[in-house]
Amino acid sequence: MKSRKLLISLALFILIVPVLTACGPTKIDVALSTYKIEMSATSAKAGDIVFHVHNDATDLTHEFVIFRTDLPADQLPLNDEGAVDEEGPGVTHVDEVEVEAGQAADLAVNLPAGNYVMICNINDNNEQHYMHGMYQAFTVK
């Protein structure tokens, strides 16, 4: 009788654990380096997503900025200084985090299905990080 209860308990545990772990947020690792954004995934399911952002640069602060947009990643609207116009046509600013060199931060967001672009919008001594290729397209399904 004890072994039957144990088997039933074990079977319930095996069935419940995947359901509970599927309920948590999607986690995506992001590495920022000199003029580069690398992500462990470029798509995710709609819902809660936590981006674990690490700045691998040794001397530059970077931003991780999320825009919802249908524009190509390399064609976002620019302001007079050459940075992305965060209120420009065709882009909706979602959220952002600034990460000092060698540091890490988490950015938790709830994203509906759609197209997104992640960028660094830092202007460092008239060097626009976005213009140097610091962007990554991202799709939420």
Predicted regions: what is each one?
Residues 63-67:
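Beta-strand signatures of extracellular beta-sandwich domains
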Residues 25-49:
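N-terminal edge beta-strand
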Residues 1-10:
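Bacterial N-terminal signal peptides that target proteins for export
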Residues 53-56:
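Asparagine-centered strand-capping/turn motif at beta-strand->loop junctions
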Residues 70-80:
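Short aromatic-acidic-glycine turn motif
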Residues 58-59, 97-141:
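Extracellular/periplasmic metallocenter environments
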Residues 83-93:
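Short beta-strand and strand-turn-strand segments in soluble, beta-rich domains
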